[in-house]
Design a protein with these regions (language model features):
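A glycine-rich phosphate/pyrophosphate-binding beta-strand-loop-alpha-helix module
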Residues: 64-132, 136, 140
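Short phosphate-binding/catalytic loops that engage adenosine nucleotides
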Residues: 87, 275, 369
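Intein/HINT protein-splicing elements and their conserved insertion hotspots or analogous self-processing inserts
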Residues: 1-51, 55-63, 108, 113-114, ...
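Amide-donor transfer/coupling interface in amidating biosynthetic enzymes
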Residues: 280, 386, 393, 434-435, ...
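Short, surface-exposed beta-edge/turn micro-motifs
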Residues: 173-175, 255-258, 398, 487, ...
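Glycine-rich nucleotide phosphate-binding loop and flanking beta-alpha elements
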Residues: 223, 266, 408-409, 451-453, ...
């Protein structure tokens, strides 16, 4: 249960809304899985530092053996993960997802959800936290197969985006400690000790002057060993355990314990009688993990971690042409607009299924433009006619058209951007677009689904709306055969476009991508012409 699931995670959009604070996988190499989701609260015209954190907890093996302890630790795990990201535990609210076998009239079966609910309630009562809402199902049986007793706890809290803490190691020669609450003989945490630990972590993360904690990991199923390995992978920063490290302790699931990476701080800086502090070791430049005289290369750890599900949720594609031709076009075209405006007007058409018109408008407003978002309505024929007139009017008043991304028309029929294409091929709209380009030196930009529309309309690469031919350029399915959502290192190959006036050929930028059809295909002649 601790192997890599990156191939599955990348199928889901992690950047939509332009509010993500933490990506699902952290570090330069995007290999350290984050234990929580942190995103800014969406705002239309202003920016904010207010964010929310959401984390979950559940151990199916523990819950199958002891539903009470499984649910109790689900709550503890979810809360600890949220605290490790920078949340104040007192601000946390919980919600539960319960799933149990069909109960029937068997008292033992009825005892499982009752036991789990008592365990969750015990943790809530001890921590002073309430659960709001949730969902339950008692139909998890098929013939003689039953689901394990399931109570998944979700912890949700507000926090400052600027104080959010991610999980990957940030630097070398930093000390790494494990902070643990006290446990009784049944491995039950002392909740008073746990609350002291939570308060201490929050105080250390909030202190801007000291900035003690570089990274943090809430220990779970795989113990400290899992934590150290995964924290090392994101930036390929090595780790050396202390000489007195007890290997047997490293694989224990110490729910409620947190591993922290600190800089320039001795253990005395946060020792107390109410929690246990263990120095695990220090980070180092050498990309390996050293323990008891043994060196384990991080590359070997990465291979072992990614191998189990690679055949199911692939992260690498088999390509016939592994080499990629390098294109460069360094000559700039110095074009000045015929008409200048203090605040350019940007028309952003919103279609059914598009989903980033708000953040596109916000980005343009931040850059000094006025955004005009108009919705294409299609419930009745009269609505379509009104939308066509509205779009043509908006284009006549604009200097820029911005096509937003998403899934216009549900990417039907059989392809992306066709709904946008159909609307902009209308004679009124097409005439307005070409007048903007040819007579007013207008600009057009497209992202995701909107870029698909630019290509299908012929605006890229021809600069005019034209009918597609059999050899027209297109965007087609990713070689890996699935949706991709991650940050991609993208090299600037040309500065011919006015949109690239602020960059140079060869510059590399980390660009958020999220698409299933991201592969540009064109004939050699078209490529040469471009």
């Amino acid at each position: 249960n601790i192997c890599s699931r990156r191939g599955l995670s990348e199928r889901f959009d992690s950047t939509i809304g332009a509010g993500s604070v933490l990506m699902p996988f952290g570090g330069k190499y995007q290999l350290t899985p984050q234990q929580n989701m942190v995103a800014k609260v969406p705002t239309l015209h202003k920016d904010t530092d207010t964010a929310t954190v959401m984390a979950f907890g559940y151990n199916p093996k523990l819950s199958a053996k002891n539903p009470y302890m499984g649910a109790l630790y689900a709550v503890v795990d979810s809360v600890t993960r949220a605290v490790a990201a920078g949340a104040d535990y007192k601000d946390i609210y919980l919600t539960f997802q319960e799933y149990f076998e069909r109960l029937g009239v068997d008292p033992k079966r009825w005892g499982k959800p009752l036991s789990a609910l008592l365990g969750a309630y015990t943790a809530q009562e001890k921590l002073g936290l309430a659960a709001i809402g949730g969902k339950d199902s008692m139909s998890g049986s098929f013939n003689d197969i039953d689901v394990p007793p399931t109570l998944v706890s979700f912890a949700v809290a507000p926090l400052s985006a600027s104080h959010a803490v991610s999980s990957e190691f940030k630097g070398t020669d930093n000390l790494v400690f494990m902070l643990s609450p006290k446990y009784d003989e049944n491995n039950m945490p002392d909740f008073e000790s746990l609350k002291v630990l939570y308060d201490m972590l929050y105080m250390m993360m909030r202190d801007d002057k000291v900035n003690l904690i570089n990274s943090a990991w809430a220990i779970g199923y795989g113990g400290a060993a899992e934590a150290i390995c995964k924290m090392s992978l994101g930036n390929k920063i090595g780790f050396e355990f202390t000489d007195c490290c007890d290997k047997s302790e490293l694989f224990k699931a110490k729910y409620g314990s947190v591993i922290i990476e600190v800089k320039g701080l001795g253990a005395t800086g946060f020792m107390g009688n109410d929690i246990n502090v263990t120095k695990l070791g220090h980070t180092m430049a050498e990309p390996c993990i050293k323990i008891c005289g043994e060196n384990i290369p991080l590359d070997d750890i990465e291979k072992a971690w990614t191998a189990p599900l690679e055949g199911v949720f692939a992260t690498k594609a088999e390509c016939e042409n592994a080499g990629m031709k390098k294109f460069e076009y360094g000559e700039r075209i110095n074009i000045r607009p015929k008409i200048t405006f203090a605040k350019p007007r940007v028309f952003i058409p919103a279609f059914p299924g598009t989903n980033c018109e708000y953040d596109s408008a916000k980005a343009f407003e931040r850059a000094g433009a006025d955004a005009d978002v108009r919705i294409f309505r299609y419930l009745k024929p009269s609505h379509i006619a009104e939308s066509i007139d509205s779009f043509a009017d908006a284009i006549d008043k604009a200097q820029i058209i911005m096509f937003p991304g998403g899934f216009s028309g549900g990417d039907e029929p059989d392809g992306s951007g066709k709904f946008i294409k159909a609307a902009f091929e209308n004679e009124k709209v097409r005439t307005a677009v070409m007048e903007l380009l040819n007579n007013r030196d207008g600009l057009i930009l497209g992202i995701c689904n909107g870029f698909q529309a630019l290509i299908k309309l012929g605006l890229v690469p021809y600069g005019e709306i034209r009918k597609a031919e059999s050899n027209s350029p297109t965007l087609t399915f990713n070689t890996i055969g699935r949706h991709m959502s991650r940050l991609a290192a993208t090299r600037i190959a040309s500065v011919k476009s006015p949109w690239l006036a602020g960059v140079e050929v060869g510059d590399i930028h980390q660009i958020a991508i999220s698409h299933g059809e991201g592969r540009f295909v064109a004939s050699p002649e078209t490529i040469a012409e471009m």
